[in-house]
Amino acid sequence: MSVPTVLERIIARKFQEVAERSARVSLAELEAMAKSADAPRGFAKALIEQAKRKKPAVIAEIKKASPSKGVIRENFVPADIAVSYEKGGATCLSVLTDVDYFQGADVYLQQARAAVSLPVIRKDFMVDPYQIVEARALGADCVLLIVSALDDVKMAELAATAKDVGLDVLVEVHDGDELERALKTLDTPLVGVNNRNLHTFDVSLETTLDLLPRIPRDRLAITESGILNRADVELMEINEVYSFLVGEAFMRAEQPGVELQRLFFPDQVKKAVVQPLD
């Protein structure tokens, strides 16, 4: 019997989590909460408009820890990080809500979103419509669907639920087969290419570059994971990828928003540093 991968362990835990949560708060109660939540802020629209201008459309991630790296940021105040990101030029935010593997929390999403005007994606491992409705009830504007964690029927069901409650969908792939499935099953314009293999946690930017020619022009390619320096950003921009999801590079910086600006908007950093002479 093979040892389950990290992703397989996470997914197994998610099914338990849904059972536990739905025993405490019914789907009907969640649906009522979702209807009374703040209106969605237009996650996909914000990214598409920025990328059309050939400007970096950055989804800045708020993430305390990961299974592969452990705790990434000790000084973790989601609202402060969100404000820093907004000042640094982020287009959207991503907030980890997985408790067991990423030390996330639902309240982190609420705190971050309340502190800024940016759209927010709930970054978690979606396996059941309950979690989608829960995301909207928490105030999320978008949800993540990870193709390697779902079959096509479930993927379509979750996307339909997202549409029903007014959420955008970011579909995540990390190889050609997953991309084909995503394009066939979903009509979301947001296609994230995760450069990190979720089974091995190895990272390669070539994953995005290899899949890019197969992503239709009417979809927005978003490169995820492994963007660590200016050269990585320039490599993507040369290949006409203007949308990025970045977490760790920012989370390890003392001021995440300043690091975002340094990586993606270096000209603005120079202007801020050079003061006019009296």
Swiss-Prot record:
The catalytic activity, as recorded, is: 1-(2-carboxyphenylamino)-1-deoxy-D-ribulose 5-phosphate + H(+) = (1S,2R)-1-C-(indol-3-yl)glycerol 3-phosphate + CO2 + H2O
EC number from the UniProt entry? 4.1.1.48
UniProt GO MF annotations: indole-3-glycerol-phosphate synthase activity; phosphoribosylanthranilate isomerase activity
Q: List membrane-spanning regions.
A: none
Q: In which pathway does it act?
A: Amino-acid biosynthesis; L-tryptophan biosynthesis; L-tryptophan from chorismate: step 4/5
What family does this chain come from, according to its entry?
Answer: Belongs to the TrpC family.
Instruction: Name it.
Output: Indole-3-glycerol phosphate synthase
Q: Which organism is it from?
A: Pseudomonas entomophila (strain L48)
